[in-house]
Amino acid sequence: MWKWLHPYAKHETQYHLCGKLSPFFGAIAVLLLAVGIVWGLAYAPADYQQGNSFRIMYVHVPAAIWSMGVYGSMAIAAIIALVWQIKAAHLSMVAMAPIGAMFTFIALVTGAIWGKPMWGTWWVWDARLTAELILFFLYIGVLALYSAFSDRAVGAKSAGILCIVGVVNLPIIHFSVEWWNTLHQGASITKFEKPSIATPMLIPLILCIFGFLFLSIWFTLVRYRVELLKEDSKRPWVKELESKLK
């Protein structure tokens, strides 16, 4: 296995491989999101309680799910980087951070828009909302800490430690509606129970969830290539690449 993986340890190989894979993931993401959002907005029936305001769910729920998923992936990468000193893991963590921050911001904004007609206010200091806001600040903190040091290795290590510590916030976000009496509704899709939403509403939601997953992979591959160029900016292969682009 290691013999097969060894050629991919080179940053130049990783750069070109990500370039080949990113259009594939991008195309799937666009297709899934286009079908899911159009289906959800135009063809899914109105909710019997919320009317048409529920349709923002097709952006809010996937963004909220993958705001946590991306952070969890960053934490795994940070652990790998700190334990086994694998530079690619540090670069992956940094590459994912802006994407996770973007998803978290989308989740917060769409949640506020959805909450206005439901709760009568744009924002309440609800347990889940507050924990999601903390998640956004964690993303910003990871990026800020990484950029705060002139030595990229020190910055990556410091940001990785913060990322790992911040993982404690993920179960708080997920279980807050069960642990405390909150305004936020419970999960519409559960692993062991029948979904609480109708199938015509559920199918486009699932498409959008997978669409956001492929979107996150696509953006991560693009961002990872950028981080590789920064890391190896003085290496011959990057200089050669720059000369070809001129």
Which residues does each PLM region occupy?
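Polytopic transmembrane helical bundles with strong interfacial aromatic enrichment
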Residues: M1-K246
